Each structure stands twice: as structure tokens, then as C-alpha cells.
């Protein structure tokens, strides 16, 4: 547990390092901390913080820089997140970009772009998972013994299946079947629909039962699409010296973007948490590069979490600015998708 003096000096050191990108010495700490301490006293406190693993000394400088552990303590206990000065402008830009009524994939891709533009780092979005339940279905006659099954999920995703039936159906019969399913089974998984149809088979006409079973079978035979990660603004990170100054580190960074497996795992983990999460490289095993951090937040459709979005940038990022950008974007993306 740090005493107030050590906490103030650590907070000041991290804030100055984020702002300037240079190791912070005792003279700078004396100027910005607001504490009336001698350089010798400050050096003693810095030595204690170094022993605790919160700061380190680069070989080329007399100053110190925060470690991943120091950043974690900072964001967990010292960071004051306030609405940015341009909060209304940020919200307006997000709203203008995320137009309700647009196709879901386009809205989600726009969210990645707006995160990148506002943060000047990389924006990332885990696209909504395909729902295992349905909101509405419709049968459409195409020709003799060929029917188009249209499935609408709670997320607004529309899926089509082609059904080959043993007999022909009239449009009125198809309407009757879809009305029955929508009235009795909407909001359930197709596996649950299959189970209930077995229980109610005696109450239904044989032709309707055949059609419903064909619909359920077609819906469950098609495997779920894999989760997709959309990334925007990777090139912004080329301008970040912390990440681009070392070629091996830069190669590793773009391997993360190319393979996406690690990002998928990280975004999936954060989708099970409430609110904004901060993953710090070197401190989180989910972030493969020590100089990289990821700020994430889940987004919803009609109150149900369906994906995650975030910003990928250097560990030396202005967290107090990036956090509200991610939070605002997640909230407004949820609103746009829920209004579809």
C-alpha cells in the first residue's frame, strides 16, 4: 500500500510520461507534483517504487518510466475519467456515423472507423454473434415443392434457407404455418422449437407438421458463422514511436492483426464483463506486446450483449480520453442496432 506522497509522485510520473514520452526525473516531479520535497527525497521515493516494480530506470536516462504494473495501479486507483471537453462533438460524430436503419454489418464497420478516427489509434469491433433464437420467420413459395424460408434474428440479421418439400403448398398454407410458429415459438431456439413440436404434434395437421420440421432442420443444419473481428486504422500505429521504433515489435503487432486469434480471445473475454475494461501489455496475458494496451467495452442489442468494441494503442495512451470514447461509442452503437 502506497502512502499519499508516493501515490502522488507515481501519478505525476505516469501523467508526465504519457504526455511527453520521456523518462521522468526528480526535477520534473518536483515541478508538477505540487509537493514541496527535496530532489533527494524524491529520488528515495522513486527507489522505493522501483523496488515495488511500479517504475523502472532506462539505461540511457536518469529518469524513470512506468512499468505495466505501475500502469495497472494507475488506471485502477488513480485515474480520473471525465467527459472530454469535446464530449458533445464526440457523441455527435458517433451518432452521425452510426445511422440506425443501415445494414448491421455497415453500422458495425462504421463503429470501428469512428473509434480509429477519434482516438488516432486502431479501432476494433467483434461483430455480433449469430443468434441461436429467432424473432420471426416467413415462408415464401418459389415453385412446386420449393419454398424460401426467411429467418429474422433478434439482432436484425436476416437469413435465408431453401426448402425442398415432398408436396406443394399454397400461399395461404404457408402464411398459416409461419403465423403459428411466430405466435407460439418466437424467441426460442430452433432446438427448443423441435422439442415442442414433438409435444404438440397431435394438435397439428400432418402437412403443417412436415413443413415446420423442414424449417427447423434447415435452420439448424447450417453452422454458425465464425466471430469476425473488424479493424480500422492499423496504419495510425505506424505513427506511434513506442510501437513502430522496433521492427521486430512492429512485425509482432501486425501479426496480431493478421491472425486475429488473440484479439478474438481478448474481445470475447471482455464481452463477459460489465462496462469498460483495460488490458495492459506485459500485465495481461491476453495482450501479446508489452508496449500495447487495449481498451474495450461490450455493446448490446435490446439489452443483450452481442459483441465488443475497443481501441488498440500504445500503453502510453491518454486513458482518460480513450475510455470515454470507447464508452460513448459502445452506448451509441447499442442504440443504433436496437433501433433497426
UniProtKB/Swiss-Prot annotation:
Q: Please give the SUPFAM superfamilies that the UniProt record associates with this protein.
A: GAF domain-like, Winged helix' DNA-binding domain
Q: Which InterPro entries match?
A: GAF-like_dom_sf, HrcA, HrcA_C, WH-like_DNA-bd_sf, WH_DNA-bd_sf, WHTH_HrcA_DNA-bd, WHTH_transcript_rep_HrcA_IDD
- Presence of keyword Transcription: yes
Q: Does the keyword RNA-binding apply?
A: no
Q: Which regions form coiled coils?
A: none
Q: Which domain of life is it from?
A: Bacteria
Q: Name one GO molecular function term.
A: DNA binding
Q: Which UniProt keywords apply?
A: Repressor, Stress response, Transcription, Transcription regulation
The processes (GO biological process) annotated in the record are:
negative regulation of DNA-templated transcription
HAMAP family given in the database record: HrcA (MF_00081)
NCBIfam families from the xrefs? hrcA (TIGR00331)
Function, as annotated: Negative regulator of class I heat shock genes (grpE-dnaK-dnaJ and groELS operons). Prevents heat-shock induction of these operons.
Put simply, this protein is called Heat-inducible transcription repressor HrcA
Q: Which organism is it from?
A: Burkholderia vietnamiensis (strain G4 / LMG 22486) (Burkholderia cepacia (strain R1808))
Q: What is the lineage of its organism?
A: Bacteria, Pseudomonadati, Pseudomonadota, Betaproteobacteria, Burkholderiales
Gene name, please? hrcA
Amino acid at each position: 500500500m502506497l502512502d499519499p506522497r508516493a501515490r502522488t509522485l507515481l501519478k505525476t510520473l505516469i501523467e508526465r510520461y504519457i504526455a511527453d514520452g520521456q523518462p521522468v526525473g526528480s526535477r520534473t516531479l518536483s515541478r508538477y507534483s505540487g509537493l514541496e520535497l527535496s530532489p533527494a527525497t524524491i529520488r528515495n521515493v522513486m527507489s522505493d517504487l522501483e523496488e515495488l516494480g511500479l517504475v523502472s530506470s532506462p539505461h540511457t536516462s536518469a529518469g524513470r518510466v512506468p512499468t505495466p504494473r505501475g500502469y495497472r495501479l494507475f488506471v485502477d486507483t488513480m485515474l480520473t475519467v471525465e467527459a472530454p471537453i469535446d464530449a458533445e462533438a464526440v457523441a455527435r460524430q458517433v451518432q452521425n456515423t452510426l445511422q440506425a436503419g443501415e445494414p448491421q454489418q455497415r453500422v458495425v464497420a462504421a463503429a470501428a472507423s469512428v473509434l480509429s478516427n477519434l482516438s488516432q489509434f486502431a479501432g476494433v469491433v467483434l461483430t455480433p454473434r449469430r443468434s441461436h433464437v429467432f424473432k420471426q420467420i416467413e415462408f415464401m413459395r418459389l415453385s412446386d415443392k420449393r419454398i424460401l424460408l426467411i429467418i429474422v434474428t433478434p439482432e436484425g440479421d436476416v437469413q435465408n434457407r431453401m426448402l425442398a418439400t415432398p408436396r406443394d403448398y399454397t400461399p395461404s398454407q404457408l402464411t398459416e404455418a409461419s403465423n403459428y410458429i411466430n405466435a407460439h415459438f418466437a424467441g426460442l431456439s430452433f432446438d427448443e422449437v423441435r422439442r415442442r413440436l414433438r409435444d404438440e404434434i397431435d394438435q397439428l395437421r400432418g402437412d403443417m407438421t412436415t413443413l415446420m420440421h423442414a424449417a427447423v432442420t434447415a435452420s439448424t443444419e447450417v453452422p454458425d458463422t465464425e466471430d469476425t473481428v473488424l479493424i480500422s486504422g492499423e496504419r495510425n500505429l505506424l505513427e506511434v514511436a513506442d510501437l513502430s521504433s522496433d521492427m521486430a515489435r512492429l512485425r509482432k503487432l501486425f501479426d496480431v492483426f493478421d491472425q486475429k486469434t488473440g484479439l478474438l480471445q481478448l474481445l470475447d473475454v471482455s464481452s463477459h464483463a460489465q462496462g469498460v475494461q483495460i488490458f495492459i501489455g506485459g500485465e495481461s496475458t491476453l495482450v501479446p506486446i508489452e508496449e500495447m494496451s487495449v481498451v474495450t467495452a461490450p455493446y448490446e442489442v435490446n439489452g443483450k450483449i452481442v459483441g465488443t468494441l475497443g481501441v488498440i494503442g500504445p500503453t502510453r495512451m491518454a486513458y482518460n480520453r480513450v475510455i470515454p470514447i470507447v464508452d460513448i461509442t459502445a452506448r451509441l452503437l447499442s442504440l443504433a442496432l436496437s433501433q433497426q
